[in-house]
Every structure is written in structure tokens, then in C-alpha cells.
Amino acid sequence: MTTIVSVRRHGKVVMGGDGQVSLGNTVMKGNAKKVRRLYHGQVLAGFAGATADAFTLFERFEGQLEKHQGHLVRAAVELAKEWRTDRSLSRLEAMLAVANKDASLIITGNGDVVEPEHGLIAMGSGGGYAQAAASALLKKTDLSAREIVETALGIAGDICVFTNHNQTIEEQDLAE
């Protein structure tokens, strides 16, 4: 699995993920890039789950973004519908976190499109650890969104055996 964290704070949205790819109990790769920019750099997207499945979902989601002129919520809802009803897609085992200047969303294969509270997304095998860390930092510090994402991923990497410390982090100004 993996850990993906996204935080909205102080006029920025930041998304980060670790780089570990595991097959069973073996680490196959340590520098995978699980967070990227989509739709002309306007959307941040990260995945947790099977890598090949995630790439399929990235392609489908980017197609929905193009179809709906970059409208994040509409594209997410349409992908979730397609994912739930298309026989080949329904077998995919991954989750997507997506964010732009307007919203942060989690998209699942069950057809769920969830906008989490407080602008915080944490998912994957280390998601619980990262969420606890990021929540505490959001409540008790004035750290930047990037610092919170970096710290939360680091804590998840210390605890979760399926998460490493090789971080990919993308950030976007909310004014863009």
C-alpha cells in the first residue's frame, strides 16, 4: 500500500505520498511517484492501492476532467459512476485523492466521492497514522500545509511497514 496526505491551509493545498511499492511482504521499489499533477497542472492527484489500477484511474479521471473543463467535483462524480458500473473498472483496487483550488476529494470504487472535513485527506496503509499527526498539527501549530504533509508522511513512514520516507510532494496556491 502507501500513504497519501493532503492539507489545505494558509492559501495552499499540498498533497504528498511516499514512494514504496510492495508485493506481498517484499519491497519492490522505493521511489515510485504516487502524487502528480493532472489537467494542465491545475489538479493534484494521488493514489493508494494497486499501481497498475491507479494508472488506469488517473487516465480515466483526466479524461473526465477534460470532458468537464476541469470541474473537479463533476469529474469525480462521473468517474465514481463509471468506476462503480463498468465491469472492468469495478475490479480495480485503488483509491484516488484529488484536489484543486476549490475542493479536496477522495474517490473510491464503491462510488463514493467524499470531501473530508477540515481540508485533510489521509489514506492508504499509513493513512490513520498520517491523519492523526496532521490533525494534531493543524489544531496545535501554525505550520504551513507543506510542513504538515511532510511531518505526517514522516510519522507514517516511521510506523507503517508499507510506507517509506521517499516523499513526493506537490503544492498549489488556492488563488490560481
From Swiss-Prot:
Q: Could you tell me where this protein is found in the cell?
A: Cytoplasm
Activity regulation remarks: Allosterically activated by HslU binding.
Q: Which CDD domains match?
A: protease_HslV
Q: Name one Pfam family in it.
A: Proteasome
Q: Where is the active site?
A: T2
Q: Residues that bind Na(+), according to the entry?
A: G157, C160, T163
Note the InterPro entries from the entry: ATP-dep_Prtase_HsIV_su, Ntn_hydrolases_N, Proteasome_sua/b, Proteasome_suB-type
Q: Which GO terms describe its biological process?
A: proteolysis involved in protein catabolic process
The record's keywords, sorted A to Z, are: Allosteric enzyme, Cytoplasm, Hydrolase, Metal-binding, Protease, Sodium, Threonine protease
What's the Enzyme Commission number for this chain? 3.4.25.2
Where does it primarily localize? cytoplasm
Q: Mind telling me which GO cellular component terms the entry cites?
A: HslUV protease complex; proteasome core complex
* Catalytic activity annotation: ATP-dependent cleavage of peptide bonds with broad specificity
MF terms (GO), sorted A to Z: metal ion binding; threonine-type endopeptidase activity
Q: How does it assemble?
A: A double ring-shaped homohexamer of HslV is capped on each side by a ring-shaped HslU homohexamer. The assembly of the HslU/HslV complex is dependent on binding of ATP.
Indicate the family of this protein.
Belongs to the peptidase T1B family. HslV subfamily.
| Role this protein plays | Protease subunit of a proteasome-like degradation complex believed to be a general protein degrading machinery.
Q: Provide the protein name.
A: ATP-dependent protease subunit HslV
